[in-house]
Each structure stands twice: as C-alpha cells, then as structure tokens.
Regions:
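Short, structured beta-strand-loop surface elements
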Residues: 1
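ATP-binding/phosphotransfer module of carbohydrate and carboxylate kinases, centering on a glycine-rich
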Residues: 4-11, 51-55, 60-194
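Glycine-rich phosphate-binding loop of actin/hexokinase-like ATP-binding domains
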Residues: 8-68
C-alpha cells in the first residue's frame, strides 16, 4: 500500500515495516517490490535478536517478533504488573480482569509510567537494531513504520531511529528518513487492493 498510496509512491528505495501481532517488512528497490525467490522477502520478524530469548511461533528462539511485537509488549507489561513494578499497569491489569493490551501500555506511557516506557523503548531498540543491518545492506532512502502497534507511543519511533542511527554506517544514514507511514494500519489493506 505504501508504494501505491503512501509517501513511498515518490521513492525508489524504501522499506516499509509493519509492527503488529507480528513484524514484517516490504522492500522496494528501483521502484519495484522485491519479493525474493519464493515470495517471502522481508520476513524480518524471524531474525534472531536473542538466542536465549523466548520460543517463537516459528519454533526458533529469540526472534524479533517474539521479543518486540504486540503480544511480546503485552506479555512484558503483564509480568511488570504481576511483579508490582508499576502501580499504574497493576491497576489497569486488575481493572481489566487480568489482561493488558498494547493500548494499555501506550496509555501508561502517556501517563509517564517508567516501566511502560522501558517496555516500549526496548521493543523499539530491538526493531531498530535489526533495521540497522538492513540499512547497511540495502541502503534505503526511507523507512516507513506502520501497523497496528506502530503508534503505541512516540518513544517507539524515537527508539527505532536512535538504534538505526547508532548501529548503521554514517554513509548509509546521511540522507535516511525514518517516519510513520501516513497510511497507518491501513497500508496492508490498501496494498492488497492495489
């Protein structure tokens, strides 16, 4: 969708990153979608970020998706609430009858909750670390961030940017733009229709 109706329509080399229940990427090179030999290019959610991390739904351990996507954010928030490390998350957890969502974590961030901020920043840093490798390899001019979890809190985007700039080569980031997709969570639907 980003290539047809978003800011990517005017860009020849970009990566669109979807952050939701999973994490994936669309890659556009020379104005064309890169799908790979079997159509699965961009499945960045299964890049390992911690070999001793949790088991992912794919069967491997420490995948980016298992560590930084929406369900992982909510699971970490539940653990923080159960441990009593955040009175606000604990209050929301009990009010929601033992459930926390990414929206709850975002709301706690906006209230200044340090534990919620740490959860979001950690996810952003992990995503940014993976994207830094892609920036060094692919050298896009733009990275667009979208998906249902992308707007959880502005600290997610800030943490992604910080990690990419810290871990990428200066030549690759000199003119790199990392911003939200203006299509938001609708990008995939728009792409399917296009």
């Amino acid at each position: 969708g980003e290539q047809y109706a978003g800011d990517g329509a005017y860009v020849d080399h970009f990566i669109f990153v979807k952050i939701g229940t999973g994490i994936g990427a669309g890659i556009v090179s020379n104005g064309r979608i890169h799908r790979g030999s079997n159509g699965c290019a961009g499945d960045i959610g299964h890049i390992c970020v911690d070999k001793s991390g949790p088991v992912c739904r794919c069967g491997n351990t420490g995948c980016l998706e298992a560590m930084a996507a929406g369900p992982a954010i909510a699971e970490r928030a539940v653990q923080v609430a159960l441990d009593g490390d955040s009175p606000l998350l604990s209050q929301i957890f009990h009010a929601n009858r033992g459930v926390l969502s990414t929206e709850d974590v975002g709301a706690a961030c906006r209230e200044g909750d340090k534990s919620a901020l740490e959860i979001v920043q950690t996810s952003g840093q992990m995503i940014g670390d993976v994207l830094a490798g892609l920036v060094n390899f692919f050298n896009p001019s733009h990275i667009f961030i979208g998906g249902g979890v992308s707007h959880i809190d502005s600290h997610l985007l800030v943490s992604i940017r910080r990690a990419v700039l810290r871990r990428s080569l200066p030549l690759a980031t000199g003119h790199l733009s990392i911003n939200y997709s203006r299509l938001g969570a609708s990008s995939g639907i728009i792409g399917a229709v296009a």
